[in-house]
Amino acid sequence: ATPDHWHALNAIDAMEAGADLYLQKPISVDVVESQAILAAARKLGRVVQIGTQRRSTPHLVEARDRFIREGKLGKIALVEIYCYYHMRFRGNPPDVDPPKHLDWDMYVGPAPMRPYCDMPWRALMEFSNGIVGDMCIHMLDMVRWMMGLGWPKRISSSGGIFVDKQSKANTSDTQTVTFDYDDLAIVWQHRSWGAPPDPKYPWGATFYGDRGTLKASVMSYDFIPQGKGEPVHKDVEYELEQYPEDKTEPRLERHVAPAIRRHMLDLLAAIEKRGRPVADVEEGAISTACCILGNIAAQLGRTLTWDPAKWQVVGDEEANRLLRRPYRQPWVHPEPAKYA
C-alpha cells in the first residue's frame, strides 16, 4: 500500500521481522531491489505472494487451459499486450507546502527530494516507473504465466511524451516495449490519448497463433479460430450471490473480487504448507525487472541483452549502472549479496 519506491525497504524489513508477505506489484522501483527482495525471501524462508492476481482469475485460468495448453492456437509467435486507458496525469498543479499531517521528507524517503504538489505519485518517475511499471507488469506477468515463460533474451523500447507536453507528469504518454524470446515476441504498447484499436479490449493481451487468436482481459476472453471452428466468448465470473457483500463493499472493483479471494486463499495455503504461491516472489521479480529494463532500453535508445544468471545486461556498463537507483541519505539501498 506504499508508493513503489518504498516497496523494497518495507518488504525486506517485514521479512527480517519474520513476516510472510502479500507484496503489491511492481515489487520494486529498480532492478537490484527486485534481486534483493528475491534473495531475502529465499534466504529467510518467507512466503511472498505478489499482487498479480490474473494468475488467480477464473476465466483466464480457463482460457489458458482450454486454448493455450491444449494447443488450439497452434504456434504462438506474437503476443500484443496493451493499455489504452487515459490514465496519465494531465494536470499542472503548483508546488506548495505539504499538508501538516504529511511528513514529506519521510514520504519521499530514499527517492530524490522534490517539491510537494497535489498530483498522483505514479505521475512521477522519481517514485515509480510510469505506466510501464504500473500496467505492463500486469499484462506481461499474465502472458508469462499463461505460456510458461521465464526471462526474455532481449528487451527494446521506444517512446516518450509525444502528446501531453503541458502536464507536470514526467512519465511517458506513448511507449512500445518488445520482449524478445527468440521465436516469440511480446510487444507492449500504451497510449494515454486516442482510442483503443478494439473498444472491448482497451487493456489486455492478444495471442496470435497459426491456428487461432485469443484475446484476454480481466473482463472477458475471445477465441477466434483460424478457418473452421466456432469462436468462443467468456465474460468475467461474478460471485454476487455467493458473496453479496461484493455489492456494497466500498471501492471494490467487482470484476476482480473472485480473483482477489482466490489469490488470498492461495497465499494462506502456501503459508500453511510453506510452499510457493501462484504469484511467487521470483515471478514478480522477473516481471518487475523486465518492465524496468524496458524503461532503461527506452532511456538509452538501444536493445538490452539480459543475463538472468548474473542479473546483468550483457556488455553494457551504462545500462548496468541504471539497474540501481541512487538512494537519498540516510536510507541505504538493499544488497542482494547480504542474502547470498
What is the predicted function of each stretch?
Residues 3-4, 8-56, 71:
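Beta-strand-loop-alpha-helix segment that lines the small-molecule cofactor/substrate pocket
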Residues 61-62, 72-75, 80, 84-282, ...:
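Contiguous beta-strand/loop segments that form the cofactor/metal-binding neighborhood of enzyme cores
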